[in-house]
Every structure is written in structure tokens, then in C-alpha cells.
Amino acid sequence: MAQVTKKEVDVVVCGLGWAGSLMSIELALAGLDVRALERGGDRDYDEFAYPKPADEYAYAVRNKVFATPAEVAVTVRYNSSQTALPTRKWGAFAPGTGVGGSGLHWTAVLIRPTPTDIKLKTYVDEAYKPGILQDDMRVMDFPFSWEEIEPYYYKFELICGQSGNTGNLRGKILEGGDPFEGPRSEPYPLPALDDTLNNVMFKEVATKLGYHPFPNPSACVSRAWKNPYGNQIAPCNYCGYCSKYPCLNYSKASPQTAVMDSLKRMPNFSYEVNAEVIKVVLNDDKKTAKGVSYIDAQGNECFQPAKIVVLSSFQLYNVRLMLLSGIGKPYNPITEEGVVGRNYAFLSNGGATLFFKDKNFNPYATAGATGQMFNDISPGNFDGPSLGFLGGAKIHSSQATGTPISTALPKGTPTWGMGYKEGLEEWYGHSMKISITTTCQSYRDIYLDLDPNYNDHRGLPLLRMTFNWKENELKLQQHLKGIVGNIAKELNPDSMSMSFLPMGADFDLTKYVSTHNVGGAVMGDNPKTSALNKYLQSWDVHNVFVPGGNAFPQNFQANPTDTIGAITLMAAQAIKDQYLKNPGPLVQA
């Protein structure tokens, strides 16, 4: 079949989630002709908006808005001596698909990392003596300062209508917020969400024990909000269907609610769904791209010429597309040469579930980000060097959903039949959780590459993930177990269960952790150790920009979306202010 060549555009955007929609609208506002290609289908709000009922089985069990492994499987192994096997069912992580991507079904915790997280290598060099940390750890600084990136955090938070309590306003510490956060130029756009009973209980005990709890920063908006693009987001009504669901009430910031409503009305923007990009096509000099090849909904292979190519798919698939396209040298863990695939990182979770016969937490009345957390156990805020590990966690009590199938039940409760129904009737609404979301460092032998054995439905190699837990992350888990246990003891439940990784634990792909995968095409100052410069521009192909979690050199305890938004907006500004005037490398190697 002959290839169909499309009309050339200024910018082609591959993937229409948070990064893709933000890059599209910013460049379209600058007057560029922007064409977006989305592998999945359209996700118009009419598909799931009120009065249609939320469907727990469809969304939370059958993963209605997630990609299927048949479309985008990866292969996984613990180490390079093993043969990786493909994922047949999502477990530890679950990427989205279609317009909105993972930004449609996210929990909407919108939190910044700390300045120490941004300059983690600098902190390690100052605080850790040689020999304390594993010698295969590969920590890096982000290639920008807090002062450079902070305005873009605030811009993204205005786009989302971020709700929360300010803790550090231009260096002044304010009561009720996070005293460890980096200085903010402006307060949170909106006040925090209301607390649920578990939040009140957790806050009281955490404060008593000397910690500094504050409300979860949220992109489920607490008040009606009109953002800088002119989009209106409705106040959250605490419906209880949030994490893994599109918002039925138009109250959760997503690409649909915060960006697409305005973007779709722009005459210089267009998008095509069910369009799977399979390769970035390079010019003969291999220093510039001339467009992308994709398969359309009818099965035709199409070529979309463009002056600028933006890869804005989910983190794993940005890395795969770079490898398939020959953009950047693939990483070799033996020689440590190459950059595409290195510094992959995930995260771990865990915590305690507490049961109280005499308390009703009314879990049906909640938002995804409803909760209290504290940041005392993050790098630089406690004595990690004396404990022999690097990293930390946000420790929180959140009530992200109140749906019955996901309800926690005491140990020994049957998982099916009459006993399950009786247990659900007895215990629904009588439990709360204390949870951890941890950092994860990058390592020499943890990486992504193309699998030599397994191909996708188009005959292209699957992405291969080589990943397992390291001693550093397991030491962190054990330290957090003691902290969470002390808080739980003070709360005095009737019974409880705890879940933490023991020393020696292997990565379990079957149990959900988070969709906070990062790294693989990281940003940095050195083209020998990073695939992208500070503006997410490929060091090797200067008209290719790659926004997303792939740019993180390691994972911090903060959820990644705020940073993905900020670095995307900073890159878009650099394209508008610098690249369009003088196309070429924005940072000299």
C-alpha cells in the first residue's frame, strides 16, 4: 500500500495527554499550525459526564480508559541475565489511552517536589560520605534551578485550579501548609478541599508526634474556577469516583477540562485519533526530523511532514519511539555509553489499613485528592545519611475513592459469596488508610531497551524493562514501616494490617502501585549522560522535543504531574522565544 503524505504543518504532536495538550495550545497560541496525532480514540466529555452513572466495574476493574497490553505491552525482567516476558495484564502500572491519556483518569494530587529533589546530586555530594550509598546508584540533578522552574509550576497550577494551603510564600512559612516546600511566588489559586474524618484523625496524631501535616494539594478544585485559557472547572461535589475514573462533574482538571475545550476551537489546531505513530522520520544528516510516520484508523501508513516534532506520549512509549527512530544512542549498561533507556525509575508504595467498629468514615463522600500528608521524611528533611539510604516519602491518609469493590476488609474475610457480602456490609465505611509514596533512585543496571524476542501487532520490537528493587529502596521501606506503625498505634484501631516491602523483596508486576513511571530519556547538562537538554530538546535531533515523565533522572516522592506540566510549559516558552527565531540547539553541548 502506498504511503499517504499529508500537508506539512509547523508542529506535529504525538500523544494528546497533559504534555501534548499543553504543548499544542501554547504553540497554537503563538500562531503555529499544530497537528496532534493520538493513538487511542477521542474522549469527549459527553462519554462519561453526569447524569450518566459512574461504573466501578467498567472503570476500576475492567480499566475502560486504560490502554490494553495488546496495544502497548512491555516486556519485563529483573536483571540482564534473564529473558524478559511480556505483560498480558496491567498490574503495577496502567497507562491511559485516547485523548487525555493518563491525565483523564488520574487521582489529581498536584504537588511540587522540593528544591532538594530538583538538585538531588548536589545534596548527595554535600551530605553523604563516600561508601554510604550503593556504588551503582546514578543520581542526577535536574538541569535548572528552583528559581527558573517555579514560575512554570505556578502557571500549570493556575491552569489546573490547584487547591491547597500555602506553606512557604516567598520565604515566609505559613501555618497549615507544608513548611518544607520550596518558596512560592504566589499562594495556591484555591483553598484546600474539605477534610474527611480520617484526615482529621491523621492530622491530629501526626501533629502530636511532631510532624507537619497539610492538605493534599489537589487538581480536584474546591471552588468554581476559570483558568488562563478561559476554561471553566466546576467545584468538586465529593462524588467518590475519582482515581481511575474520568470526572463526571467537570471538577477534576484534565486535558479535557483544562485545555482541550479551548484548543479545539482554535483554527490553527487539528487532531486525528486512532493514529499510531510508529517512527520519527529523520533527514539524511540525522540531525533533524522531517516528520513522522503513522498508521491511521483505516490502516493506511501516512507521513506527516512537520518543522517541529513533539513526542508527548506516556513515558515508556516516548522512550520506545526514540529507540525505534534512532534518536539518540541506546544505553548500554555494561559500558554506560548511550543515553536512551538509562535512568529508568519507578516507585514503591505501602502502608497500613486500620479498622474501627465504632467509626463511620463515609467513604462515598470524597474526592481523589482528599487527604492530609506530611513531607518531613523527604531528602534533606531528616537524617538519611545516618540511616544508610537516600530518599524519602510523603506519608498520607487519603480517601481517594469510596467504591464498594475496592473496600478494604479485615484479614480472614471471604473474597466471594455470602461471606464476602456479609463482610462488606459489616465493614464498609469502617476503615482508613495510612499510605506512603516513595522516592526511587536510578541505577546503572536498571534501564529500558528494545526487546530482541517480542514484537507488537505491527511487527515492531516491544519495549523491554529491566527493573528490580534495590537495597536502598528496601531500607527506606523498613524505615517508613516504623513511622507508619507508630502513627497507627496512636490511632488505636480495633485491628489493622500493614504492607511494606521486606529486605530482599523482588518487584511484583501483578499488584498495582502507581502509574508514575519515569526516566529513560532524561534531561541534563551533559549529552553523554542525558538524552535531552533543559528544554526537553534532543541533543542529537534539534527539532525533536520530548516532554513527559521520561525526562526525570530519578523519581521523587511528589506525584509527577505538576513537574511534567512545568517542564512542558518551560520547553514551549523556549520554543516560542528562542527556537522559532533561530532553529538549532538551544543549549550548547
What are these regions (language model features)?
Residues 5-19:
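Beta1/beta-strand and adjacent pyrophosphate-binding region of the FAD-binding site
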Residues 216-219, 238-239, 278-283, 429-440, ...:
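A glycine-rich dinucleotide-binding beta-alpha-beta segment and adjacent secondary-structure elements
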Residues 41-66, 96-108:
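Conserved N-terminal glycine-rich FAD pyrophosphate-binding loop of Rossmann-like flavoproteins
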Residues 26-29, 33, 40-56, 266, ...:
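Glycine-rich loop(s) and the adjacent beta-strand/alpha-helix scaffold that form part
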Residues 60-62, 68, 72-74, 85-92, ...:
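Conserved redox-cofactor binding core of oxidoreductases
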Residues 45-48, 163-184, 494-505, 581-589:
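Short, glycine/acidic-rich hinge or "gate" loops at secondary-structure transitions
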Residues 78-95, 99-102, 106, 110-126, ...:
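FAD cofactor-binding and catalytic pocket of flavoenzymes
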Residues 45-49, 107-109, 116-121, 225-227, ...:
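Short, solvent-exposed loop/turn and secondary-structure capping segments
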